[in-house]
Regions:
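Cysteine-centric segments in proteins
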Residues: 1-92
Length: 92
């Protein structure tokens, strides 16, 4: 049975959240402004990148790179023309 870990970042006026459910098959869900916009699965502790769009005009392509393990999962937010940012873990 896996455990759920939550991460968040605000970017360009939009809320980006990620949930990583660990286990033999890790599941990553990404929400933009509260709506699920992307998901992916990976096996064991292999990293996975989820590509999503921010609803800007024109839409902005961003991605969340999730690493389920080993240890505590982590998520990195990547957007054009900026350094990658570590997403803050959330306790809920």
């Amino acid at each position: 049975m896996g455990r759920r870990h939550h991460f968040h970042i605000d970017h360009d006026g939009h809320s980006v959240s990620a949930t990583v459910e660990t286990g033999r098959t890790a599941v990553v869900e990404v929400l933009v402004d509260g709506k699920e916009t992307g998901h992916a699965t990976t096996h064991d502790d292999h990293p996975v990148t989820v590509h999503v769009e921010l609803p800007t005009d024109p839409p902005t392509q961003v991605s969340v790179r999730a690493t389920p393990g080993p240890g505590v999962p982590r998520c990195i937010f990547e957007a054009p023309a900026m350094e990658p940012h570590i997403m803050s873990p959330r306790p809920y």
